[in-house]
Design a protein with these regions (language model features):
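Rossmann-like AdoMet/SAM-dependent catalytic core
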Residues: 157-159
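Charge-patterned, long linear interaction tracts outside catalytic cores
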Residues: 162-167
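Conserved AdoMet/S-adenosylmethionine-binding subsite of the radical SAM
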Residues: 1-154
Length: 167
């Protein structure tokens, strides 16, 4: 993307269309295209984020921009009048502090979306191993969710999110 600007070139093709354009990225590169983004009639830009802990981010998303760069991108885009949203994904049980993320992004987002951590195939073994090594205090909780299919954590979280959105 940095070298070839594929997204920018696609956006240039769409700018005069009536297409609804929604961009979701972990990257902060779209800040460079604020002028182009402002030309769209129906556009929103989302940033994906699941932690404020940059060490955890480095473990889970080693090639992605830092947490601060993503937060800065949201602020710059929103300040420029571009509709923005936050995609908290994936939510790592017991580790993703949704309330802290929402406090940090308040005033810079127009909406928020959520997605839970889904573990399939080799990712399940890899993540459970990571949790056992780095966050052993949460391993039983992860095993309950991802081995025993216990949905209590997600049910409680969903109720909390609904309560937050109502208040």
């Amino acid at each position: 993307e940095v070298k070839f600007h594929k997204s920018r070139n696609i956006l240039k093709l769409l700018v005069n269309s009536d297409a609804h354009v929604e961009i979701l990225s972990k990257s902060d590169l779209m800040v460079e295209d604020i002028g182009l983004l402002k030309e769209f009639r129906d556009l929103s830009v989302g940033i994906s984020l699941n932690t404020l802990d940059d060490d955890f981010r480095k473990d889970m998303e080693p090639g992605a921009p830092s947490v601060q760069r993503r937060l800065n991108a949201l602020e710059k885009l929103h300040s420029a009048g571009i509709p923005t949203y936050l995609f908290i994904s994936p939510i790592f049980p017991y580790l993703t502090d949704i309330r802290a993320i929402l406090r940090e992004t308040a005033g810079n987002i127009d909406k928020v979306c959520f997605e839970n951590l889904n573990l399939r195939g080799s990712a399940k073994k890899e993540i459970l191993g990571y949790i056992a090594e780095r966050y052993p205090q949460h391993l039983d909780g992860y095993k309950a969710i991802y081995t025993k299919k216990d949905t209590a954590y997600w049910t409680k979280l969903e109720a909390e999110l609904q309560s937050m959105s109502a208040g």
